[in-house]
Amino acid sequence: MRQRTIVCPLIQNDGCYLLCKMVDNRGVFPGQWALSGGGVEPGERIEEALRREIREELGEQLILSDITPWTFRDDIRVKTYADGRQEEIYMIYLIFDCVSANRDICINDEFQDYAWVKPEELALYDLNVATRHTLALKGLL
């Protein structure tokens, strides 16, 4: 089984949290709402990976004013690829508390939508199990 280290930002701006809706046909949680983030590449430092993933998935215009390591956890997930193949992967999640100075988002093709969500509205979204667990640990669900 392949292992991936995943950097995952919990991004907050003016009391709202950023959620991204995965595309329907691929990824670990197709069609569900999630936090952004992705894999650390070989030789890449953790914060470099976090900033790269944010740039790739959310665009160059989003400015983070604060990044603080928060927690980590692991689990096993099945990833679905665009061609329909599936792979079981051991995931190690490194989760960061982040504050953004703005809300300038330009999502890439991994997502079909995004939303800045008030804490009391988070439970209204079809959150994937990993995001639900993370938000519950934070006391937001």
From Swiss-Prot:
Belongs to the Nudix hydrolase family. NudI subfamily. It catalyses: a ribonucleoside 5'-triphosphate + H2O = a ribonucleoside 5'-phosphate + diphosphate + H(+); a 2'-deoxyribonucleoside 5'-triphosphate + H2O = a 2'-deoxyribonucleoside 5'-phosphate + diphosphate + H(+); dUTP + H2O = dUMP + diphosphate + H(+); dTTP + H2O = dTMP + diphosphate + H(+). It comes from the Bacteria. The keyword Cell cycle does not apply. Residues 1-141 form the Nudix hydrolase domain. Its cofactor is Mg(2+). HAMAP family: Nudix_NudI. This is Nucleoside triphosphatase NudI. Keywords: Hydrolase, Magnesium. Monomer. InterPro entries: Nucleoside_triphosphatase_NudI (IPR023781), Nudix_hydrolase (IPR020476), NUDIX_hydrolase-like_dom_sf (IPR015797), NUDIX_hydrolase_CS (IPR020084), NUDIX_hydrolase_dom (IPR000086). GO terms for molecular function: dCTP diphosphatase activity; dTTP diphosphatase activity; dUTP diphosphatase activity; magnesium ion binding. Catalyzes the hydrolysis of nucleoside triphosphates, with a preference for pyrimidine deoxynucleoside triphosphates (dUTP, dTTP and dCTP). A motif (Nudix box) lies at residues 38-59. Pfam families: NUDIX. Its EC number is 3.6.1.9, 3.6.1.12, 3.6.1.-, 3.6.1.23.
